[in-house]
Amino acid sequence: MSGTLSSNNNGIDTKNDNENVSGNVNGNENQTENQNQNQNENENGTGNESSNEPPMKKIKTESGLDDSNPTFDFGITTDSSSQNIENSKSTPSEFTSDSTSAFDSAVKNSDGLSLPKSVAPSTDLKKDAIPTSNSGLALPKKNEKKGKTTGGKNVNKKESGKPGAKGSQSQTDASKMSDVLFSAGVDIREEEALLTSSVAASKTQSQPAAVNIPEHPPFLHPDQVAAFMKKASKEQNFNQNFAKQGEILQMISSSCENYMRDIITNTIVISRHRRKAVKVNSGRRSEVAIALKSIAIQQKKDEERRVKKRIALGLEKEDTENKIDSEETLHRASNATAGLRAGSKKQYGWLTSSTNKPLAATGKGAGNIAAAIAARGDTGLRFREAREEPGIVMRDLLNALENRRIGSHNIITKGYARIRD
């Protein structure tokens, strides 16, 4: 009996195994068919997001995975399923009667679904890298790119159509504005013309006018410089016409200008140092000058009274002509020597005038007294306050020329001869 029971149990187990294997094979075939259909639809571009087809139902397994793809490639085909069936028939089952009954009850309650067999995972990465399910993340498709780009173009076209509408609205607004201004009595064209004219006038005022500065004239005239240089060249025994050489004439003129400028600046500096400690417009004389002037006036009055007494007594006529001649000769001699030294022929009027003319009119009142005093040469004490002359005087120019060695010797001697104290 035990032998028959075990054989019956083995027969039941093999039947259940065959049913499970056939169910697994049918499920795997359905899965492969669904995968092939999904791949064909992806290649033909039927997987757009805007399609109205209902999403595929996910096959729920007892492992708790939501994806339709198995996590591992089990490599189940029809050939392998047949081999597994033959192996299951040939090999006896390792389960006991208790385990098989529990396993069979669990399989019967699983609604035709079975657990996957323990098969080693495949090493083919290309199959794993290509997702076949619609759920989860997926790579972009060709048709999706085209659809997006075309949609973007349509959006751009729509957006490009908007500014045209805005431009038309702005034109209508401008026309309405012009109508309103025209009805108010404002001429837009005249206002624009006035605005442009005012802007142009402001620009012309802001720009400075071009100033045409004339050329600086030469310090010395070129003809005069050429004549002087020709004369100097003849003295040096060579003849050259400098009239055709304007650069040389300009150089000589500029050098003379610099020479004179240096002399004048030195003269001005010396005159300023000379007048530095003296107040030009003081308006007040010193007490010493006032006392000397009063003494000179008193001496002149005393001399006039003495001359009157001598004329009244008849004592003034003795040896007057000899004294006048002797004084006149002395003054003429001194004037001649000074003229020879200075090289000038000018003579002062008070030395050349004759002194005999006032004596011819003697005996006629106060004129005789003045003539007698003039004949005696006693005109009293001349008063002169010590004041510095304003500006540049001869002393300043001579002081500036004394520092120069070339061409200034004769000028200095003539200048000192002409100074009048």
Curated annotation (Swiss-Prot):
Protein's UniProt keywords contain Glycoprotein: no
Annotated stretches, region: Disordered: 1-176
GO biological process, one term: transcription initiation at RNA polymerase II promoter
Superkingdom of this protein's organism: Eukaryota
GO MF annotations, alphabetized: DNA binding; RNA polymerase II general transcription initiation factor activity
Entry annotated with the keyword Transcription: yes
Any one cellular-component term (Gene Ontology): transcription factor TFIID complex
Biased composition range(s): Low complexity: 19-53
Biased composition (Polar residues): 1-13, 66-112
Domain Histone-fold: 226-294
Major subcellular location class: nucleus
Oligomeric form and interacting partners: The 1.2 MDa TFIID complex is composed of TATA binding protein (TBP) and the 14 TBP-associated factors.
Function: Functions as a component of the DNA-binding general transcription factor complex TFIID. Binding of TFIID to a promoter (with or without TATA element) is the initial step in pre-initiation complex (PIC) formation. TFIID plays a key role in the regulation of gene expression by RNA polymerase II through different activities such as transcription activator interaction, core promoter recognition and selectivity, TFIIA and TFIIB interaction, chromatin modification (histone acetylation by TAF1), facilitation of DNA opening and initiation of transcription.
Family statement: Belongs to the TAF4 family.
Name of the protein: Transcription initiation factor TFIID subunit 4
High-level lineage: Eukaryota, Fungi, Dikarya, Ascomycota, Saccharomycotina
